[in-house]
């Protein structure tokens, strides 16, 4: 393959050599050939794209070659071509000899023919797929600009474009499937190009494209890697285990023979016939032989038929394959069975049916396999061929990906910066993947090709970096111009100044030339005589250089295209005092950017005056440049005397300030300071640099401190770099700066108090602080000395640079590696450690390469750790501290550092899963080696077999303890336990702190489990103790002790190493631990006859209690009274008691999410029988982090809605405390006579009603029809001009014939869909944050209402009574008090609520009678009304009205705006909050009510419950509202799955709290997805205003930067966020001066901040009137209330006055017309009068007289009009 590839690539490159060598001798031949071709070639419609690349085009001459490759005319046959020296040289590596031009053209012509004709003999050795793959590979290896020289390149590009157009609109799954199944390299390349293109534009197509591209670029899937090799490896492992590793191989041999049945198998194969029926018979006989007929008989026919169909559809290209499988004769081969097996194996490995050439090679290998030895050799040859062909497929796949990425690297495809950055990241991923393949020993022969692919990707990476750099700002350079007469020494001074500014040689730019390829980009740039040429626009050139915008230089060389100007200091020289005339348009911009130094040489000038005409002697010039006079002009001085006029009029009107005289040193210092000051704003944003340390000393001590720091670096083998001054140099670690007191520095500073050479002796013992005399913590010292920037892989090793080993680990298993790596990782890096461990398990022989690849993506801890890994693949040394360095060695290198003995390498078997990384030759060699060992073991004597058995028995486990030690008494139990000093201290401190008596083995095992992330209680507590110990590790001080022994320095601890009691978790970073039990008021204790506690029970209501059977068995008492009426169902049981607890808990048959103390629960919730100390119990296994104790049985496990789903019945004890056994809730009928009416009867069967699953009711309540809205008499003719009309009236309405029932059903369907909402842990954390935020202004323990009538009078009496009583509340009241039916209903519900029992959560459904937009009327869209039960509303008002009022009373400060008056100064407070934010987002939501998650609503109700007094009334209200709502209409009852009914009590407050929780969850999830751990209260760092689904979010810049992800998370929760105006598009920040909230535009008017009501809402007040109920809404009402109607129009005029005079005049005309036609006694106010009235009411000067708060009359925001 590599030889043929060299031919393809060398075809063009070699042509340049031989064309020049034979140009003269072949001139006449070329002329004749061109003439002949011109006469003989047929006319073509378009020119051949390859003609320009050849002397004689092979595309055009190939047409005269026959399909069989024979000779016809002047081109020789293929057989003759292969005999030429040119063909031989092409296939060899020696290309020093010249290639004959004619032969080269003939070879190219035949290759062209072979690509177009499958029967050409060249295809015998290579199939068309291979030839095409070679050309694609050549494309990938060449730069994109050189690919046009390849054969068929344009054709392949066109093919890929056609595939792109065909597949571009396909989904991602389809494209990924195509990559795995397609065998067309052009199609695969096109698919990769589509995936990568959409990944680069993932903002438009979705982030999943980018994530999928990153994942798939790292994967190369093949059948042989994933299935075939592991299968064969497992077979070899099993064979070894049963033979070589079997202590009794002789006993196994008969079983092996009986299992394989070799004689029967040989007879079946010998009688095989190569026909379709023969293959069916042979395969069926083999299946019968091994008893697998039944499991495969259904697929045998389809397998054989499918394979032959594929062969039959093959073209003539596969002629030999057809002949092989359809008609092999005896003279060709004795039996084709093995050929068929080899062909199938070749297909599985390479993915292609073997072509003629490959089958010929297979046939040649198998033809001579007549003996055992020759068969083994043939098998090895086949394995080598298969490995080579498989490697070819891998290289082809990498080539396709490289071509796709390289073709996307152009500005027309990846145009914006984001797409370039993503393309850069993908190119780096593929580059690293190819680099990993270069480390694979199987791919060593393909390393030249892989390196070329990496070179192509390097070009892409470089190009992307250039394109990124062009789009970014750069530091503004400093430009100084040295002006003066010729010969004064300006240029020499400029060069000397450049040396003082930088150690680098200066770059030089000459403006007389228009290209700058010689520019090197060094820190200092010199432009000599920049204004010498009048043809150059040097003013604009200088302005472009001294700018923050990138400056692209004009370069001629292709590799320099895109070169940027990057120098920091620019030194120019000029002979002109005024380089740019002040009258120039660019003079201001020019002089603002440059500083001019007037240079004079007084000695030279005096010599010229005294001796004119003589040369200036050398004595007039000094080495220290003291002969020069350097005068620095003031800012914008265009000459020595004047400054530019800012107005650009009189440039000689402003005198220049006196100059500042400098020397060469002070000038260099001034330029450095100017550069620092000019770019200070960019450095200030970076903040304090934590990797820079400054050591401040006096000027005379600088060199001594530098030597001391270098000695420290050498002594500790540190990674930091020592620098003198504040300028830093490149370093792999921190930088230590030696500073003087007056130097500015951005980093940590330490004052050196002891500085002398004698301090070097103090370095012994690592006393660095004492040697330098600095007060520096050990943590900072460790960070300074050992911090590593990034991840570094070292291929070359120097022993003096290796760090001292702290740990040496022999990798005998995966767990050794995982346990050692945990020392290097942060907690966030544990997942990467597990992945690395799995990779090592699957490929242990590639440990160094895998560690090298794994290290690039993991995060390391700040502790300094050095570990040496002894692996079968070599030695790996890993050093980490923030970053990491790794050395991969092929030999043992163990240095001092506590290692007492050199460990021996581990022995990891290379088979099983690791077989996928081994070449086929090694797999078959392992197989034959195993067979040889088995054979030798059988032939040898019994003594050898006995010895083998004795040898195998060595590895059996031995007893470790006898006698007194067998019970593991004593701390050092077991054998082989060795602890380091640090581990010993940890063990002692852990036992002492936690008051435990753990052995060393148990301690190490506990630490191991905790490191791997176990969630049992012991592991969780150990991690907490470890974190606390780590935080206190540095709590010590250096003290001086003066005693009898003299003066000595010691370190004493300021705090003990013990775990810290965190108390209440205010970090919000993790779930809180065990806390208060759920349903505390509903839990009671079950005792025995003596009063001893046995367990717990939970009150279900009405004196019925639930517990577990083993607690209730025997004589059991509850509150001193014997229980009765005990019923059991398995382990779950119920009983009755006359003692009733103050509250009750709801029960539900579902899966729990929390244990009794609030900790998360992990369970599959599948009941199984378990053996316990109380017998066999059927329950569900669960794990929690809470430790339980005997007597906790019966405590409740709850779901997200607070419903009890199971009871605790057992735990795993001290050994496995996290294991819990939970008895699920099952229904037990404990009912007596019902005490309350309930519509929804669970005992009735489910029915389907218009697509809804519901229960049928005994009574039918129809949906009210008609409307009370009528057209005003003033607009009977023009009412259609109004944008709104009354909502659809049902099937008889011509505007929309949709029935009211259909409207209700369509509205209810979204409520029946399940909405998950945010993740459990995220919601729980945000709930804690919101409670903590509200606690600042909402008191706790707010008392609930104890009077039923007082609670009832808090309700709105104009609303429905609900499903149990018809009409409105005020219809059932006499003299302000409820009548008997209403009072009886309230009393029944109140009685249950006082016992804490949840009430039926049922609503009656109606449709809102309101004005709707005309387009929504046509669609039949109406809003539903959920009529809540008056009893439930009364109980909820008693429970939560006080909490709700406390929240709404603080709307000016909190996030909930319920209760705000938008026509009062409150709107000014809102405006103040809005304008103080960095970014403001106004958001509305579609279908808000139906998309609410029940878990979020339950969390909001729990917030209300948190601030209440937790009375039984509160328990009843909370449990009622958290239960699923039931909608009742048309005689059916529907239980909904999600959503929040609009008629739910306190719906506005609950909706607003839901809104806060949703936004908080979205922000938290977005930040932590970006790697930002949220340990603070989010609601304290941003502001928001919510009123139901209306929201305004005031985000800081950190939140605004992830706003797209925040709104994406909200959509993922099931919500539908939209813009306020409902327009299509992403939600963007809005102008804070015009925010829309609650249909009001908060803006500034001449009268101040006002909330302007929508104009259309004001206008439609004049078109419609509320009157009697009717279906004829176009007819005016029979009677009009002049008082309420007049007040309504008066208010409309007041609101209109805030929109200005022009709009008010329009409203004034409508008001006059309404007064005239409606016969009202009203005089509409003038504009100024209306304005005055509104402002007086706004400021509270005038009492309001409108009906805005009266729901029974026509007001601007009542249910009649949509505001």
From Swiss-Prot:
Keyword Membrane in annotation: yes
Active site positions, chain numbering: 1110, 1131, 1193
GO CC list: host cell endoplasmic reticulum membrane; membrane
Molecular function per GO: ATP binding; ATP hydrolysis activity; cysteine-type endopeptidase activity; RNA binding; RNA helicase activity; RNA-directed RNA polymerase activity
Ligand binding (ATP): 484-491
Species of provenance: Feline calicivirus (strain Cat/United States/Urbana/1960) (FCV)
RdRp catalytic domain mapped to chain residues: 1478-1603
Chain positions with Phosphothreonine modification: 1040
Enzyme Commission numbers on file: 3.6.1.15, 2.7.7.48, 3.4.22.66
PROSITE patterns membership: CV_3CL_PRO, RDRP_SSRNA_POS, SF3_HELICASE_2
Domain Peptidase C24, first and last residues per copy: 1073-1229
BP GO terms, sorted: DNA-templated transcription; proteolysis; symbiont-mediated suppression of host gene expression; viral RNA genome replication
Impact after mutating residue 1071 to A: Complete loss of infectious clone recovery
Lineage: Viruses, Riboviria, Orthornavirae, Pisuviricota, Pisoniviricetes
The protein's name in its UniProt record: Genome polyprotein
Domain SF3 helicase: 458-614
Domain of life: Viruses
């Amino acid at each position: 393959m590599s030889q043929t590839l060299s031919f393809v690539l060398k075809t063009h490159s070699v042509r340049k050599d031989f064309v020049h060598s034979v140009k003269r001798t072949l001139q006449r031949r070329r002329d004749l050939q061109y003439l002949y071709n011109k006469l003989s070639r047929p006319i073509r419609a378009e020119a051949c794209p390859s003609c320009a690349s050849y002397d004689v085009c092979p595309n055009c001459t190939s047409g005269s070659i026959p399909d069989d490759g024979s000779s016809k005319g002047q081109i020789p046959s293929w057989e003759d071509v292969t005999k030429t020296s040119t063909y031989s040289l092409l296939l060899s590596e020696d290309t020093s000899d010249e290639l004959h031009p004619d032969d080269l053209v003939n070879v190219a012509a035949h290759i062209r023919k072979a690509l177009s004709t499958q029967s050409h003999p060249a295809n015998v050795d290579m199939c068309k797929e291979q030839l095409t793959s070679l050309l694609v590979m050549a494309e990938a290896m060449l730069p994109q600009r050189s690919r046009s020289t390849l054969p068929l390149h344009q054709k392949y590009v066109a093919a890929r474009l056609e595939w792109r157009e065909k597949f571009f609109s396909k989904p991602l799954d389809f494209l990924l499937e195509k990559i795995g199944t397609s065998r067309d390299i052009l199609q695969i390349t096109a698919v990769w190009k589509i995936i990568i293109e959409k990944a680069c534009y993932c903002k438009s197509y979705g982030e999943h494209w980018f994530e999928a591209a990153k994942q798939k670029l790292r994967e190369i899937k093949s059948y042989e890697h994933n299935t075939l090799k592991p299968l064969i490896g497992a077979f070899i492992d099993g064979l070894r285990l049963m033979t070589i590793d079997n202590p009794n191989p002789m006993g196994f041999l008969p079983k092996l023979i009986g299992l394989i049945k070799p004689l029967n198998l040989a007879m079946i194969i010998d009688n095989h016939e190569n026909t379709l029926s023969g293959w069916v018979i042979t395969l069926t006989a083999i299946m019968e032989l091994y008893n697998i007929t039944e499991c495969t008989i259904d697929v045998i026919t389809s397998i054989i038929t499918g394979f032959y169909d594929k062969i039959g559809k093959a073209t003539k290209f596969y002629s030999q394959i057809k002949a092989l499988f359809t008609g092999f004769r005896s003279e060709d081969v004795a039996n084709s069975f093995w050929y068929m097996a080899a062909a199938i194996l070749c297909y599985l490995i390479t993915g292609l049916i073997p072509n003629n050439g490959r089958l010929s090679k297979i046939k040649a290998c198998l033809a001579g396999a007549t003996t055992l030895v020759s068969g083994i050799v043939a098998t090895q040859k086949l394995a080598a061929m298969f490995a080579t062909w498989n490697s070819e497929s891998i290289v082809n796949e990498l080539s396709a990906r490289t071509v796709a990425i390289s073709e996307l690297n152009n500005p027309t495809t990846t145009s914006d910066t984001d797409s370039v950055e993503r393309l850069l990241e993908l190119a780096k991923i593929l580059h690293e993947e190819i680099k990993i393949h270069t480390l694979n020993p199987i791919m060593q022969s393909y390393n030249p090709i892989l390196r070329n692919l990496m070179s192509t990707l390097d070009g892409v990476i470089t190009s992307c970096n250039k394109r990124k750099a062009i789009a970014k700002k750069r530091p503004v350079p400093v430009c100084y111009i040295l002006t003066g007469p010729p010969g004064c020494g300006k240029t020499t001074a400029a060069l000397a100044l450049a040396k003082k500014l930088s150690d680098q040689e200066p770059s030089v730019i000459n403006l007389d030339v228009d290209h700058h390829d010689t520019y090197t980009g060094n820190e200092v740039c010199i432009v000599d005589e920049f204004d010498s040429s009048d043809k150059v626009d040097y003013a604009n050139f200088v302005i472009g250089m001294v700018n923050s915008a990138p400056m692209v230089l004009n370069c001629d060389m292709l590799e320099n295209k895109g070169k940027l100007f990057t120098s920091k200091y620019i030194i120019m020289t000029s002979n002109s005092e005024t380089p740019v005339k002040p009258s120039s348009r660019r003079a201001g911009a020019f002089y603002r950017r440059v500083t001019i130094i007037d240079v004079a040489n007084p000695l030279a000038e005096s010599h010229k005056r005294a001796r004119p005409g003589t040369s200036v002697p050398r004595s007039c010039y000094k080495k220290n440049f003291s002969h020069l006079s350097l005068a620095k002009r003031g800012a914008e001085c265009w000459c020595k005397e004047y400054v530019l006029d800012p107005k650009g009029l009189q440039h000689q009107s402003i005198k220049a300030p006196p100059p500042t005289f400098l020397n060469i040193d002070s000038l260099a210092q001034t330029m450095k300071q100017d550069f620092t000051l000019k770019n200070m704003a960019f450095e200030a944003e970076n903040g304090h640099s934590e990797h820079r340390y400054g050591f401040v000393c006096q000027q005379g001590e600088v060199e001594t401190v530098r030597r001391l720091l270098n000695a420290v670096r050498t002594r500790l083998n540190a990674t930091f770099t020592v620098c003198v001054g504040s300028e830093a140099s490149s370093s792999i670690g921190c930088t230590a700066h030696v500073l003087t007191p007056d130097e500015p520095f951005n980093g940590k500073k330490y004052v050196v108090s002891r500085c002398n050479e004698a301090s070097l002796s103090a370095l012994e013992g690592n006393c660095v602080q004492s040697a330098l005399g600095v007060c520096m913590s050990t943590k900072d010292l460790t960070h300074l000395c050992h911090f590593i920037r990034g991840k570094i892989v070292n291929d070359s090793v120097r022993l003096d640079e290796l760090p001292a080993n702290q740990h040496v680990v022999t990798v005998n298993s995966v767990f050794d590696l995982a346990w050692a790596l945990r020392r290097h990782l942060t907690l966030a890096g544990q997942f990467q450690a597990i992945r690395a461990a799995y990779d090592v398990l699957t490929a242990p022989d590639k440990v160094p390469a895998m560690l090298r690849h794994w290290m690039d993506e993991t995060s390391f801890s700040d502790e300094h750790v050095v570990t040496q890994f002894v692996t079968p693949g070599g030695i790996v040394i890993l050093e980490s501290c923030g970053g990491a360095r790794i050395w991969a060695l092929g030999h043992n290198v163990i240095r001092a550092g506590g290692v007492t003995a050199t460990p021996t390498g581990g022995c990891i078997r290379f088979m099983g899963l690791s077989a996928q990384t081994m070449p086929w030759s090694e797999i078959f060699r392992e197989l034959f080696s195993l067979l040889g060992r088995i054979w030798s073991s059988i032939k040898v004597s019994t003594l050898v077999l006995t010895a083998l058995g004795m040898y195998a028995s060595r590895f059996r486990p031995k007893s470790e303890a006898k006698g007194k030690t067998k019970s593991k008494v004593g701390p050092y139990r077991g054998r082989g336990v060795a602890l380091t000093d640090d581990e010993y201290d940890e063990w002692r401190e852990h036992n002492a702190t936690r008051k435990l008596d753990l052995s060393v083995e148990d301690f190490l095992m506990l630490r191991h489990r905790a490191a791997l992330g176990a969630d049992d209680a012991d592991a969780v507590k150990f991690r907490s103790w470890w974190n606390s110990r780590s935080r206190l590790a540095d709590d010590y001080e250096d003290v001086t002790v003066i005693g009898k022994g003299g003066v000595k320095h010691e370190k004493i601890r300021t705090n003990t190493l013990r775990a810290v009691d965190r108390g209440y978790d205010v970090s919000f970073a993790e779930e809180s631990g065990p806390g208060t039990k759920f349903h505390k008021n509903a839990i009671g204790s079950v005792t025995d006859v003596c009063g001893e506690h046995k367990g717990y029970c939970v009150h279900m209501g009405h004196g019925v209690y639930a517990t577990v059977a083993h607690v209730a068995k025997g004589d059991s008492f509850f509150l001193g009274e014997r229980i009765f009426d005990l019923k059991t169902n398995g382990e779950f049981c119920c009983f009755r008691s006359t003692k009733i607890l103050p509250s009750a808990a709801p029960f539900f048959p579902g899966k729990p999410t929390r244990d009794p103390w609030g900790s998360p629960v992990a369970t599959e919730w599948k009941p199984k029988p378990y053996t316990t100390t109380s017998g066999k119990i059927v329950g569900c296994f669960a794990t929690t982090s809470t430790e339980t104790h005997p007597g906790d049985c019966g405590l409740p496990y709850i779901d997200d809605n607070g419903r009890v789903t199971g009871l605790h019945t057992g735990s795993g004890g001290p050994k496995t405390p996290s294991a819990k056994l939970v008895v699920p809730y099952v229904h037990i009928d404990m009912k007596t006579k019902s005490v309350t009416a309930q519509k929804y009867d669970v005992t009735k069967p489910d029915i389907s009603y218009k697509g809804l699953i519901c229960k049928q009711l005994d009574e039918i309540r129809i949906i009210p029809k008609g409307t009370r809205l009528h057209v005003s008499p003033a607009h009977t003719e023009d009412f259609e001009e109004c944008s709104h009309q009354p909502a659809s009236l049902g099937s008889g309405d011509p505007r929309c014939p949709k029935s009211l029932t259909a409207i209700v059903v369509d509205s209810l369907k979204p409520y029946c869909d399940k909405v998950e909402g945010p993740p459990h842990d995220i919601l729980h954390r945000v709930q804690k944050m919101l409670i903590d935020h509200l606690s600042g202004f909402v008191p706790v323990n707010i008392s609930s209402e104890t009077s039923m009538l007082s609670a009832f009078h808090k309700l709105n009496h104009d609303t429905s009574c609900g499903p149990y009583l018809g009409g409105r509340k005020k219809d059932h009241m006499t003299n302000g008090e409820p009548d008997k039916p209403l009072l009886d209903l309230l009393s029944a519900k109140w009685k249950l609520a006082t016992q804490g029992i949840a009430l039926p959560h049922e609503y009656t459904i109606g449709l809102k009678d309101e004005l709707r937009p005309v387009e929504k009327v046509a669609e039949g869209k109406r809003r539903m009304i959920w009529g809540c039960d008056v009893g439930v509303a009364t109980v909820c008002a008693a429970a939560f009205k006080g909490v709700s009022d406390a929240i709404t009373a603080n709307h000016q400060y909190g996030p909930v705006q319920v209760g705000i008056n938008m026509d009062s100064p409150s709107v000014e407070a809102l405006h103040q909050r809005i304008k103080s934010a960095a970014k403001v987002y106004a958001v509305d939501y579609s279908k808000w009510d139906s998309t609410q998650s029940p878990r979020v609503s339950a969390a909001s109700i729990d917030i209300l419950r948190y601030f209440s007094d937790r009375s039984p009334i509160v328990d009843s209200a909370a449990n009622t509202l958290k239960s699923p709502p039931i909608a009742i209409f048309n005689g059916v009852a529907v239980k909904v799955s999600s959503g929040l009914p609009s008629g739910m009590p306190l719906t506005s407050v609950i909706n607003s709290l839901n809104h806060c929780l949703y936004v908080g969850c979205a922000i938290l999830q977005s930040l932590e997805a970006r790697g930002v751990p949220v340990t603070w209260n989010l609601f304290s760092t941003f502001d928001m205003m919510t009123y139901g689904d209306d929201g305004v979010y005031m985000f800081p810049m950190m939140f605004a930067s992830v706003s797209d992800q925040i709104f994406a998370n909200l959509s993922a929760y099931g919500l539908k966020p939209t813009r306020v105006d409902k327009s299509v598009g992403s939600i963007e920040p809005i102008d804070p001066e015009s925010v829309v909230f609650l249909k009001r535009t908060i803006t500034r008017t001449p009268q101040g901040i006002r909330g302007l009501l929508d104009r259309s809402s004001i206008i439609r007040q004049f078109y419609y009137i509320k009157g009697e109920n009717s279906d004829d809404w176009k007819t005016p009402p029979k009677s009009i209330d002049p008082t309420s109607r007049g007040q309504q129009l008066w208010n409309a005029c007041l609101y209109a006055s805030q929109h200005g005079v022009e709009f008010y005049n329009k409203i004034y005309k409508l008001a006059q017309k309404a007064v005239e036609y409606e016969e009202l006694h009203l005089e509409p106010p003038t504009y100024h009068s209306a304005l005055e009235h509104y402002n007086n009411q706004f400021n509270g000067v005038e009492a309001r007289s409108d009906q805005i708060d009266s729901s029974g009359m026509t007001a601007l925001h009542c249910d009649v009009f949509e505001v």
